[in-house]
Amino acid sequence: MHSSYSHFLQRLRTSVSYLSVSHFPSTSSHRLFSTTIGVFARKKMPLLTESERTEQLSGLKTAGWKLVEGRDAIQKEFHFKDFNEAFGFMTRVGLKAEKMDHHPEWFNVYNKVDITLSTHDCGGLSPNDVKLATFIESIVKK
């Protein structure tokens, strides 16, 4: 093991011991400990069930989203007046994606933006893909 990694682990153990044993009541330290560790061990996002796919993807398909051949993903191409409008759109989507911690695969040339959504953590379409696609549709309609 690298010495810097070993040093990091030792400091983490010391910090957790310090927080949980000596300075907080047990219920607070447990919550603090769980919250801290939760950053490292996020819950895996579930795939959409068959009924969720039927229900939630139908509206997106009507809006022009397509299933990607050979992948569990959805894709749509957007066209704008010019690069400035396309870039503004990408900025809005990027800010929302960052808040969701869910980032699209996308490609931009001048006034065209091609977006593919899939959740890498679960290997396919998840509720986050539907949520982000729905947000994208809401800002395109404005």
From Swiss-Prot:
Belongs to the pterin-4-alpha-carbinolamine dehydratase family. The gene is pcbd-1. GO terms for biological process: tetrahydrobiopterin biosynthetic process. It comes from Caenorhabditis elegans. It is an enzyme of class 4 (lyase). This is Putative pterin-4-alpha-carbinolamine dehydratase. InterPro entries: PCD_sf, Pterin_deHydtase. CDD domains: PCD_DCoH_subfamily_b. Its EC number is 4.2.1.96.
